[in-house]
């Protein structure tokens, strides 16, 4: 009998010790009132983006104006203390300036050349854009082949009647040397340094505005910038649109490029803006600005 009582007392003591141990463990796991959560709790809490400040200077393509304006506005809601400046001086100037270190990021509406890459320029493609062939709204010509377009810009076709239009001498409008739009247009058609321009302009807006005011004019412009003051003709039977640029069926298209320099560390603010511009977050923003996100290209 005494052995049974002793055994029962021993079992009771073991149970009591186990209960005390569990209680201590629970107390050690629960934070005291007013104290921060343990690392296990913190792991379940999302960390917001680091708040940055400073200025990011960008320079280059005028065709990227709408995309850059949208990027800057949207990025400002994430990093309100970062100021992003955009200067539309042309693709060539933007590439030159980023390589010289006078701006943080360059902007180009054409692919980088092998020479520019050899100098350290890095090509970050954010979108694709069609180069629309634009005419006056009263012009009855609605479709041109790439061969006809090349012949018009080289001065081999000089009257609209030669391509099914009204009788009238064609006024050929284009961009200035160094323009990314001009570089892409001439390269795609194989007419580099062979164009017979009536007038050259320093911005996409100037080309569109002058074509809109001249019934005999033809020009080229970023599809994302085309408005109802001009008509964008079909090329080889394909109407320029975001869809035909994305699927590759529209023949005259080029990339929108954010240019950085190999081995050159960006400021935290500039790096954050670059990361944002290259992220999937901006796909809808690019589309709303009239371009095609690079991720959607065929």
Predicted regions and their residues:
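Exported/periplasmic ABC-transporter solute-binding proteins
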Residues: 4, 21-25, 30-32, 36-100, ...
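Positively charged n-region of N-terminal signal peptides that target proteins for export
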Residues: 1-9
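C-terminal motif of bacterial Sec signal peptides marking the signal peptidase cleavage site
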Residues: 15-19
């Amino acid at each position: 009998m005494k052995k049974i009582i002793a055994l029962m007392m021993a079992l009771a003591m073991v149970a009591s010790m186990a209960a005390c141990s569990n209680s201590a463990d629970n107390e050690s796991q629960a934070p005291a009132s007013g104290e921060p959560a343990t690392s296990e709790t913190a792991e379940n809490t999302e960390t917001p983006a680091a708040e940055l400040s400073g200025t990011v200077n960008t320079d280059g393509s005028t065709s990227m104006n709408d995309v850059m304006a949208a990027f800057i506005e949207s990025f400002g809601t994430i990093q309100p203390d970062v100021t992003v400046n955009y200067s539309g001086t042309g693709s060539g100037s933007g590439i030159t300036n980023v390589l010289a270190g006078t701006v943080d990021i360059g902007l180009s509406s054409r692919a980088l050349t092998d020479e520019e890459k050899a100098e350290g320029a890095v090509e970050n493609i954010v979108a694709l854009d069609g180069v629309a062939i634009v005419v006056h709204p009263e012009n009855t010509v609605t479709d041109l082949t790439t061969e006809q377009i090349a012949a018009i810009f080289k001065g081999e076709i000089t009257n609209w009647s030669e391509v099914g239009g009204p009788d009238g001498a064609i006024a050929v409008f284009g961009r200035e040397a160094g323009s990314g739009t001009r570089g892409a247009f001439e390269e795609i058609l194989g007419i580099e340094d062979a164009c017979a321009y009536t007038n050259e302009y320093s911005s996409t807006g100037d080309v569109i505005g002058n074509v809109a005011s001249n019934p005999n004019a033809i020009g080229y412009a970023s599809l994302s910038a085309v408005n109802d003051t001009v008509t964008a003709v079909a090329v080889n039977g394909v109407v320029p649109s975001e869809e035909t640029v994305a699927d590759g069926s529209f023949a005259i298209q080029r990339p929108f490029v954010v240019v950085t320099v190999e081995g050159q560390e960006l400021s935290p603010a500039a790096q954050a803006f670059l990361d944002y511009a290259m992220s999937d977050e901006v796909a809808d923003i690019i589309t709303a600005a009239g371009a095609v996100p690079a991720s959607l290209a065929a």
